[in-house]
């Protein structure tokens, strides 16, 4: 059933159709090649906005640093990062005055979390800069490597597994004269292949020890690696994002925990909530402003955009904020929280892979690593790159650029939101002391500002005052990209408000379709996405029914599983026809086995296997749900799995779907080619790590899984657990005396 899309819009009001103008269908753009240029752009831009600050030199690393704090007050509308400390502190004080006790309560909550968080919190998150290998790794591997190096250098605070103890190690490591690390390297040899008698290149992986002096270690500890942000829609240019290393991560986590706790208590904050909860919160603020603007008042809303939010934020400002927020707290707590902003004031940006050169005539390609940019002759580069390199050269040390001002993308989202809200908070009449007043919403760098005043002049004055107040704390509202409307129509974090939030359905478009995990998961995810959009995004019954039919069609084409009685010929059709003919109850066949589709919009919540179970032939049931079926490598499947779906905006979301284990829930095997590369050692580490975790989970199944308290190691915890379980099983008669004795014997040998 193919549909002419224009039919969908015949009776649609204009505001509901606005979402179709978004660049959301089709594949998003991905970046290829090196991110070095984008990173240099970021570094140069950041320095440009703060160029009138003071230059100093870091005594430990020798890095030149620019400090724009308390710099000149702006005289024009250009973006600038000259935040004034006293203004930031005053904004914090007013925020506390409006919300008595907010900072103290959040500090108490955070203090409790700080004392309880385990170091494995850092295994969450994707790519992390691994300072031991000087490149990105999965978070768990990077953490394991860091702890291993710490241990071999005599730092053992992290044995008990608390994050705070690991951070003590980090602090101590920075005072050490030198650190010894193990790095991987590749050897290439030309050897003759016995079978083919041809020459082949053989690679072997070596590990070697390397000593880093204090300066080199500090540079690595303060380094943020950079990557290009992928899949960004609606932009012509790509941009760089940062992946910090393990030394910085833990400290940032605690600062963000405190800031999150504050944001939860602020009605103007769009973080940390999301979805329908966020919409309700925002609608409240709008309602408040509209009810308060009596017949005599005008109310206008600015859909705001800030110029270069990250480049103009400053870690030194965050330090001032934290110092103020924690001023009544114990010394140790204040110290732990102030380290993240201090590290960020001394951060180094790693320039990535460097540049690739190719000579067409000689068919040669060569990579110029970032480390060489400081000394290479610039005649090889084009004009724009040459300018970039010239600008950045004074800042380069060992292939990293000193970047003191500015925050890289996504590092302190919560804390910067607190700063933004503190300016919105100043709009109350009791603070403005004039006829105009404002309120609004803030979510990281996105904001909406609602201004009320008796006349247009008042609105203009209110906006001007807001604009100038923001400038004082390093926030630059863009006059070109912000626009103003009568209150009732605005956009905030891609939610469109028109007397209530309009469902922006096109945001969800990319998550429709076949995910490509396996036949079982794809069917389940597909129908769950449709179900969720009927609940949350005004997907109407007729459109949902159409989406479902398109999905089934897409699914059949993807897995070549057209109905058994179809005329379409594919590689699978011969087998599927045979199955169709020998099946008595054809309605019981899964769609992926050439069966009919029994889904409609009423039964989307039921997994397909359950939907058809009663209709299946017995021998088909036996084949489909047989754990001993030799053709299937099984994962142990929980009743609920998580899929990663890509909405068009923001990060990939995790979505739950029902998982029923059948012979269709296969897991593809890993690509073998990784085994011949330098990643092999890492892969083995990762598998080792995985095995240990799985073993641990076996002893502490999630229902009873309370992490072992105290200082026992994983092994001790598992042994004591095994003893308890064995005793219970023995006393209840589930195991024999001999078995019990054997278990006890094994336990004591392990100890």
From Swiss-Prot:
Cited Gene3D superfamilies: 6.10.140.720
Motif, Nuclear localization signal: chain positions: 187-195, 203-216
List the disulfide bonds in this chain: none
Instruction: Name the enzyme's class.
Output: transferase
Q: What is its EC number?
A: 2.7.7.48
Gene Ontology MF, one: RNA binding
Question: Which top-level group of life is the source organism from?
Answer: Viruses
> Could you say which protein family the record assigns here?
Belongs to the influenza viruses polymerase PB1 family.
Q: Can you state the subunit structure given in the record?
A: Influenza RNA polymerase is composed of three subunits: PB1, PB2 and PA. Interacts (via N-terminus) with PA (via C-terminus). Interacts (via C-terminus) with PB2 (via N-terminus); this interaction is essential for transcription initiation.
The main place the protein resides is: host cell
Catalytic activity, as annotated: RNA(n) + a ribonucleoside 5'-triphosphate = RNA(n+1) + diphosphate
A GO-annotated cellular component: host cell nucleus
Location in the cell: Host nucleus; Host cytoplasm
Per its database record, what is this protein's job?
A: RNA-dependent RNA polymerase which is responsible for replication and transcription of virus RNA segments. The transcription of viral mRNAs occurs by a unique mechanism called cap-snatching. 5' methylated caps of cellular mRNAs are cleaved after 10-13 nucleotides by PA. In turn, these short capped RNAs are used as primers by PB1 for transcription of viral mRNAs. During virus replication, PB1 initiates RNA synthesis and copy vRNA into complementary RNA (cRNA) which in turn serves as a template for the production of more vRNAs.
Family matches, as PROSITE patterns:
RDRP_SSRNA_NEG_SEG (PS50525)
Domain RdRp catalytic spans what residues?
A: 286-483
Q: Which parts of the sequence are annotated with region: Disordered?
A: 54-82
Which UniProt keyword terms apply here?
A: Eukaryotic host gene expression shutoff by virus, Eukaryotic host transcription shutoff by virus, Host cytoplasm, Host gene expression shutoff by virus, Host nucleus, Host-virus interaction, Inhibition of host RNA polymerase II by virus, Nucleotide-binding, Nucleotidyltransferase, Phosphoprotein, RNA-directed RNA polymerase, Transferase, Viral RNA replication, Viral transcription
Protein name (Swiss-Prot/TrEMBL): RNA-directed RNA polymerase catalytic subunit
Please note every region of biased composition (Polar residues): 54-64
Segments carrying the region annotation (Promoter-binding site) are: 249-256
**What InterPro entries does the record point to?**
RNA-dir_pol_NSvirus, RNA_pol_PB1_influenza
Modified how: Phosphorylated by host PRKCA.
Provide one Gene Ontology biological process annotation.
symbiont-mediated suppression of host mRNA transcription via inhibition of RNA polymerase II activity
Q: Which organism is it from?
A: Influenza A virus (strain A/Duck/Hong Kong/2986.1/2000 H5N1 genotype C)
